[in-house]
């Protein structure tokens, strides 16, 4: 069976990671959550007081980039790889609303994107990989054999994210989550370096009214068309 690169891009909280994990498991491919990488850098910036509600010391973050070591380590109990920042498991810490509030601002920094894109491209050298993010099909793997672009209404995405955070025990309001989603959309689509856009050869999926099973079945069919699975 031909091994391919699958690029999944789209807006925040569209279920990119969930779909990518499902595909990687089904195909026995490597899964890389690039959003976790940017979240880890944002968390690092927060911990080192480089960014806050009303300030962002980009120069300090850029200077500290060589000190940031990111690594995915597979957790057999959970069935997926967790993010490690300088040797520490930060999978839980990077999923908070606080990190969500800053991740798009950190991802705007060209030096951050350059460092992470290079690392992501190295991960995909041997294909057989599913990678999700904002610029996978346009920048990281412009020659990917299959490109998916996922979208849904801001309200639908905010509700999904709110429900997820509630299940984790995070005390947040729907209004705050919706505000975060809208702000991230604007920053992601308006940044100068690698803005969020749909690749010319990507297949767009609006999953506002699709459940996970319907979405997975549709995308798996697309994969089968590309790799010619009988």
Curated annotation (Swiss-Prot):
GO terms for biological process: nucleobase-containing small molecule interconversion; pyrimidine nucleotide metabolic process. Its main location: cytoplasm. InterPro entries: Cytidylate_kin (IPR003136), Cytidylate_kinase_dom (IPR011994), P-loop_NTPase (IPR027417). Keywords: ATP-binding, Cytoplasm, Kinase, Nucleotide-binding, Transferase. It catalyses: CMP + ATP = CDP + ADP; dCMP + ATP = dCDP + ADP. CDD domains: CMPK. This is Cytidylate kinase. The gene is cmk.
